Curated annotation (Swiss-Prot):
The protein's name in its UniProt record: Partner of Y14 and mago
Skewed-composition ranges (Polar residues): 104-121
UniProt keyword ATP-binding present: no
An example Gene Ontology biological process: regulation of translation
Compartments, as annotated in UniProt: Cytoplasm; Nucleus, Nucleolus; Nucleus, Nucleoplasm
Biological classification of the source: Eukaryota, Viridiplantae, Streptophyta, Embryophyta, Tracheophyta
Domain of life: Eukaryota
Amino acid sequence: MGSRSGEQGKRMAELSKNLKEGERILEPTRRPDGTLRKPIRIRPGYTPEDEVVKYQSKGSLMKKEMASQGPPGYEPDPAPKPKTKAAKRNERKKEKRLQATAEKANSSEDGSASNGSQSVNVLASEMEALDVSSNNDVCGGAPNPGTTGEDVEKRIRALKKKIRLTEAQQQKTASRDLNPEQLEKFSKLEEWRQELKALEDKAA
């Protein structure tokens, strides 16, 4: 064992004598079985295989570059500038406005909840607005002698619309869900039909 180490020392001394400029010697390393490897002379400019930079194509380099920059079209925000007094004032105004609109929205939601139960009454209110005939006409009284042909046509159109809306509402809603106002409209349906017939006869 001692002779081997002596031999290694001699070999190292010989190699170091013959070294050229920039060369170096890698000392002997021990194998797993306990024996020593030979000392290695390393020429100048040599880089070990595992330290050599691997070749990368242009595409892979571009991918890496793009990944570091973020998605296409992305521009990082520049450093934020200190806000002026006017900008701060404007921000406060915006916040107040947003709070006011949020409060209004909350109050309107509360109101809409109460209006939700009255959604069935919308058609009824439309029919009230279309009320054209007076009580005398409904009872079968003769229309005003001064009415022109255009007035009669308008009345006929209005009555047809009222009848159509009432019939549509009658089909949509069940009889048990009706409120008194709707029941009244349905009871007037036959009277409106009679009035319409009378007006159509008169127009003819």
